[in-house]
């Protein structure tokens, strides 16, 4: 049994689901906050210093994968447990490459959620039993080799790209990221140049393929 009440941050854009997680987790842990997008997750993690973040992948403004990577860059000790509907093996491997300690499918029942939380907080890794560990480990190694290709875009460019793929206009993106529309346009130009994209449609396809947004 854990000797103290670890601090947990919940990140999920479905309010009812997030509140359900809060009520469940509060029976054993201290839930320090609930946020609904990746930007809020990064900001809250830096402010609240949780021991663990329970995070979904598909979130607006900034997806869970990129948010997790940003948090791990400044808080390497924080534990990340992805809780998502997506059972795509490549996505599971990518989550672990970005710093996850656990990956749990939302198809689990409420009682099953507590075991992976405890395991990850103890320093162990956890994966939903229905996922193939050998295949995930293979893809993790493969994804590590492809890391340089993934880094064609800067952190800021990935943020701009996700918002573009979500259908946001330049002014909206500028307001969200606190930059001028001219700076947004410059980032878009550099993104298209780096990816060899010639249209917004190609940018959206790239964002979907790289799990920044849902299809």
Language-model-derived ranges and their functions:
Residues 169-202:
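Recognition helix of helix-turn-helix DNA-binding domains
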Residues 56, 84:
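Active-site residues of response regulator receiver
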């Amino acid at each position: 049994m854990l000797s103290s009440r670890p601090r947990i941050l919940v990140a999920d854009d479905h309010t009812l689901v997030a509140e359900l997680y809060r009520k469940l987790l509060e029976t054993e842990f201290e839930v320090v906050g609930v946020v609904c997008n990746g930007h809020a997750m990064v900001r809250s993690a830096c402010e609240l210093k949780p021991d663990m973040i329970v995070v979904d992948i598909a979130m607006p403004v900034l997806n869970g994968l990129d948010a997790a990577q940003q948090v791990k860059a400044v808080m390497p000790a924080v534990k990340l447990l992805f809780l998502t509907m997506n059972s795509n093996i490549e996505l599971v491997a990518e989550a672990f490459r970005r710093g996850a300690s656990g990956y749990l499918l939302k198809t689990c029942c409420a009682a099953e959620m507590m075991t992976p939380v405890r395991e990850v907080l103890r320093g162990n890794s956890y994966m939903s039993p229905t996922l193939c560990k050998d295949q995930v480990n293979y893809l993790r190694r493969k994804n590590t080799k492809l890391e340089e290709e993934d880094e064609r875009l800067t952190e800021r460019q990935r943020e701009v790209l996700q918002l573009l793929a979500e259908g946001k206009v330049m002014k909206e993106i500028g307001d969200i990221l606190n930059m001028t529309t001219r700076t947004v346009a410059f980032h878009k130009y550099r993104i298209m140049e780096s990816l060899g994209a010639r249209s917004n449609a190609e940018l959206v396809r790239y964002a979907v393929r790289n799990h920044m947004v849902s299809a």
